[in-house]
Structures are given as C-alpha cells and as structure tokens.
Regions:
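Active-site helix of classical SDR
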Residues: 132, 168, 176
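C-terminal substrate-recognition "lid" of short-chain dehydrogenase/reductases
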Residues: 129-132, 144, 225-254, 259-260
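Catalytic Tyr-x(3-8)-Lys segment
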Residues: 122, 210-230
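Short C-terminal tail/terminal secondary-structure segment
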Residues: 2-9, 103-106, 157, 237, ...
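Substrate-binding pocket helix/loop in short-chain dehydrogenase/reductase
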Residues: 107-109, 113-118, 216
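Short, small/polar-rich loop/turn modules that mediate ligand/substrate recognition or access, typified
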Residues: 184, 189, 247-249
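Residue(s) in the substrate-gating loop at a strand-loop-helix junction
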Residues: 152
C-alpha cells in the first residue's frame, strides 16, 4: 500500500519487564531503546559501568522505567543477581534478551588461545545458559514468557578469523533449541536473532579488515547494514510480544537477505 507510514505500537509490550545484557552499546542499546519505545520496562546490564550509566541516562528520557546493573557475566553469581535485581525493580520478569558477548578476535584459527576461547564462551553461551536457568522459575510463575538469544552469521555461515566466536554463537543456538523444545509446554518461548547491523564489533572489524568488510557489505542484497534501533530492535520486540505467541525454536536472520534462505 502506498501512502501508509509505519507507526510503532506504543503498547505492544506495555507492562512487560525485560532484562537486556550487553545493553550499553551497539545492538544491546538498540534493543533496549526499541523495548522502551514499545512500553516495556528494561533492566540494562553491562560490564562497562561508566558507559552503561551514560546509556541509561539517555534512555531514561522516555516514559518507561529503565534501570542499570553493572555486572561481569563471568562471575558465577551474576545470573541470580541480575534476575533478583529485575524482580526487585519491576516486581517480576517477562522477557530476557541475552545479547552480551566478548571476543579477542579476529585472529587466525591457529592463533586463538585458551584465554581467547574461555572469554567468548564464558560471556556468551555459559552466561546465556545460566541466565536462562535463573529466569526460568520467574517466567514459569507468570504462566510463560519469552527469551531471545543473539546468534550470528559468523556461526551460521562461517566467518574466517572468528573461530571461537562462531563456535560460541552456534553453542547459543544449540542451547536455545534445546530449551525451546523443553519449555514449550510451560509457555516459555525461546528464539534466536542473528543480526547484521552497524555496531562496535562491526566497526572494529571494518578497521582491522577493510577489504573483507567491503566484500561482506556488497553481499547484502538490501545494500546496507541494519540499524540497531530500527531494524534489529523491532524484531526482538516482536519475538518478546504476544504477537509471536506461536513462534518458538526459530532462528531469525535479520541481515538484509545475506543468509538467503540457507
């Protein structure tokens, strides 16, 4: 239809409380912003305390409440502490977005160290696993809920010089599928979003490997990178909302067509 301007439904997630990890920058910040615009309350979690405070201050200009919680996801007590903080702030939790990741890549596969491997797996799949376990009883008590975990085309398609990162992201997809199958009868949905968007990680890659970056950009059928707030965030909001109540165990490629139905 022509002449129709898309509008954001401000009540899509009205009354929902959502945890977002890695929320200080990039994709996480874009998701948090989109959630707040659609009526959710957000607990923003990140290890960068100073940047997180600045992000939350900016996001707090809207009508919905947003709280900051600095946390190192490598700490084995962090998952329970994060969920407890969300319940304390908002009374309950309806959704979880596991976005946080850390990596020392790009590196050649043979140069990746145990420390590199441990970093990306601890902040990625292990923290994702533990946060899902920690939030489960809260979601169950609410009669259900939704979890969105962030994957990556680096894993689904394979990206040279991101061996550990790709493995960690595919581990997150495996965890997500298993939980989705097990928790479906509990009313808890689990899905994965794989974004290709302008972010700190993408910018770092562009600086380190500009030719590879340009090749990758040319491979996007839509001809551009996604915007974290207006392209990635809305898809996550949809998956957290009742509009997607029959959607679980799916990987959604929000990449401008790069994956091409693979």
């Amino acid at each position: 239809m022509t002449g129709v301007t898309p509008t954001v439904p401000p009540t899509l997630l009205d009354g929902r409380a959502v945890i977002v990890t890695g929320a200080a920058r990039g994709v996480g910040r874009g998701i948090a912003s989109a959630l707040l615009t659609r009526g959710a309350s957000v607990l923003a979690v990140d290890c960068d305390e100073q940047l997180l405070a600045a992000t939350v201050e900016a996001l707090a200009e809207g009508a919905r409440p947003v709280r900051a919680l600095p946390a190192d996801l490598r700490d084995p007590t962090s998952a329970q502490r994060i969920v407890a903080a969300a319940v304390d702030a908002f009374g309950t939790v309806h959704g979880l977005v596991n976005n946080a990741i850390a990596t020392n890549e790009p590196k050649r596969f043979q140069d990746i160290t145990r420390e590199d491997y441990d970093l990306v797996f601890d902040v990625g799949p292990r923290a994702t696993f533990e946060l899902m376990q920690a939030v489960y009883p809260i979601l169950l008590g609410n009669g259900g809920g939704s979890i969105v975990n962030l994957g990556s085309g680096s894993g689904t398609l394979g990206k040279p010089k991101f061996g550990a990162y790709a493995g960690a992201k595919e581990a997150i997809r495996g965890i997500s599928k298993a939980a989705a199958m097990e928790w479906a009868r509990d009313g808890i949905r689990v899905n994965v979003v794989c974004p290709f968007a302008e972010s700190d990680g993408i910018r770092a890659w562009r600086e380190m490997a500009p030719e590879a970056y340009e090749r990758s950009l040319r491979s996007v059928p839509m001809g551009r990178l996604g915007d974290v707030g207006t392209d990635i965030g809305p898809v996550v909001c949809f998956l957290l909302s009742d509009e997607s109540r029959y959607v679980t165990a799916q990987t959604v490629m929000v990449d401008g067509g790069t994956a091409g139905f693979r």
